[in-house]
Amino acid sequence: MSVTRISRESLNDILAGNAREAATCVLKFYSNSCHMCQSLHEYYIHISDNEKYKDLHFFAFNVDDDPEIEASLNFKGVPTIFVVHSHIGNRPATLRLLPDPEDPNEVTWYKVRDIKAFIDKEAL
């Protein structure tokens, strides 16, 4: 599966339970000015293409499009990754935040193995 850039309106629909179907999503928040976000980009795409994750939806949201998103979802800084379990029927989504790494990668912040382990634990 590929990564889809998501709008604030679509993100709001997922979070509020206004999605067309219940789904599990992996959501990366990034900024165009963040060098670590740019370095993580290809790895995130590669993870999304893994057959193991074929039933998951991978999204990316540019925080430059809505600077208030960090406060509304209670995270600080990018890149940031969530697993989101969306529901239907106006039932709010369940969000799980990938914790900041104890030993961050100096180029990408997160390590690929940590992202995969997080997805395996929270989404599969």
Q: Predicted regions span which residues?
A:
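Short, solvent-exposed loop/turn segments that connect beta-strands within catalytic domains
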Residues: 19-23, 54, 87-94
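Beta-strand elements of modular eukaryotic interaction domains
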Residues: 15-18, 48-49, 68-73
